[in-house]
Amino acid sequence: MNKKVVGFVYALLTVIILSACSTEEVTTNHSDPQVSVSTTVKPLTKKEFSEVEISELTSPSKQDFRKVHVVLTLRGTDYLSNIQVKLPNYKQAFNNMKDDQQIRYWFGSGADEEQENKNIYTREFVLYTKNLNDQQIKDILATGKIKTSWGLKDTKTKNQEEFAAGKNIKFEAK
């Protein structure tokens, strides 16, 4: 009986020691990425206004235009794979305003940047805002939804989330 107990303890200690020395990566539970969205609406500079094509408009001025800058940051992306982000279609939203026949979305650009443990998605566009107030602009920006999806590298689990695009909208003085 004593030999069986000693043998069992010896076998148990061997298993514990071998488990501790294992080189296999331990799977950990990584949380979803942290998401932040910021939107800034500001007047154009003189230089920016000089680059805007205004021939189709009657008596346009620099004050009739605004630049919108949207930044989405995903932090904690080192453990994620197949990250996909779909930002709102602001061109469609601004050009199809109810009771407004004006083309509002003038032009825009965007960039996606992967850094260490974070991804940054930037969109910038120029709006023709004559006869629009800040609240109307904010309402249209706020209706947009940002859709994200990703997989966890260690578990292959797929996740997706939707965020309000208009959470942090700041207007800079005209």
What do these predicted ranges mean?
Residues 29-38, 131-174:
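Surface-exposed edge beta-strand/loop patches
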Residues 100-156:
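Short, solvent-exposed, Trp/other aromatic-anchored flexible loops in extracytoplasmic proteins
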Residues 1-9:
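Bacterial N-terminal signal peptides that target proteins for export
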Residues 11-14:
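Helix-turn-helix-like N-terminal two-helix hairpins of bacterial/phage DNA-binding regulators
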Residues 23-124, 162-172:
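N-terminal export/targeting and maturation segments
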Residues 16-20:
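C-terminal motif of bacterial Sec signal peptides marking the signal peptidase cleavage site
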Residues 3-4, 55-57, 130-132:
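Short secondary-structure boundary micro-motifs
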